[in-house]
Amino acid sequence: MAWIQIRLNSTNERAEAISDFLEELGSVSVTFMDSQDTPIFEPLPGETRLWGNTDVIALFDAETEMQPVLTALRQSGLLEEGFAYKIEQIEDKDWEREWMDNFHPMQFGKRLWICPSWREIPDPNAVNVMLDPGLAFGTGTHPTTALCLEWLDGLDLTGKTVIDFGCGSGILAIAALKLGAKNAIGIDIDPQAILASGSNAQANGVADRLQLFLSDRQPADLKADVVVANILAGPLKELYPVISQLVKPKGDLGLSGILKTQAASVCEAYAQTFELEPVAVREEWCRITGKLA
């Protein structure tokens, strides 16, 4: 069976109302997506967490006349004047198979691979992390995650303790453990991230070496040889006193989730106590690394 798909750009404040309205107009399915691949966690019961700039995607039966749908949307007041939209015909497919086919093993640095569980491992002798998209995003596809994974791959983590601040799926902490770290600690504000990290650690056989804490319950004396934080520039600057205190003397720090235009202000904050290295850039994103002076 074929479908007609309409994709509308919206804000997170209006996305749910638009979704409800489209269902009233006869949509059989409505989903939310972010074109910039920004990480987001699965919502808690009764909660819908969205990106600041959200695309609303609705499917209609192929026989649906879309002009009345567009007219109703214009008259609803839910979208800005001259709102952007795209309508296209979608052929029926095995959507689960299609989704799975889009994820492939990815290499980061010289040793590290991130592999979906349903794919064959390209190099059994490499450091392989098995991770599937699921409870929390963070699978290596976003430039910031890739930058952090490559940085960890380039460090000698043998016998060291690593803190993954804002752990999400736990991908960075798990990768660090597989790369030789003795122990890792994951910290996040979201309980769903803690669950996801624990599940992924279990699947990779490293759960016994990973401690997980909600940020308001982390021990006051936490310290690590390596601290990595892949969040956003604003929180990185605000949390400078917290993050910098987590790093042991002569320890390593890696920060990402930072746009190129924001790098200077983040560097200014952390240069107070860290000897910073040249900024690494990928697409519009960058990574800041340094050693505690």
UniProtKB/Swiss-Prot annotation:
Species name: Actinobacillus succinogenes (strain ATCC 55618 / DSM 22257 / CCUG 43843 / 130Z)
Catalytic activity: L-lysyl-[protein] + 3 S-adenosyl-L-methionine = N(6),N(6),N(6)-trimethyl-L-lysyl-[protein] + 3 S-adenosyl-L-homocysteine + 3 H(+)
E.C. designation(s): 2.1.1.-
Free-text function comment from the UniProt entry: Methylates ribosomal protein L11.
GO molecular function: protein-lysine N-methyltransferase activity
GO BP: any one term: methylation
Compartment list: Cytoplasm
Protein name: Ribosomal protein L11 methyltransferase
Lineage of the organism: Bacteria, Pseudomonadati, Pseudomonadota, Gammaproteobacteria, Pasteurellales
GO CC field: cytosol
Gene: prmA
Gene3D superfamilies (alphabetical): Vaccinia Virus protein VP39
UniProt keyword annotations, A-Z: Cytoplasm, Methyltransferase, S-adenosyl-L-methionine, Transferase
Similarity section: Belongs to the methyltransferase superfamily. PrmA family.
HAMAP family, alphabetized: Methyltr_PrmA
Top-level EC class: transferase
Superkingdom of source: Bacteria
Residues given in the record as S-adenosyl-L-methionine binding sites: T145, G166, D188, N230
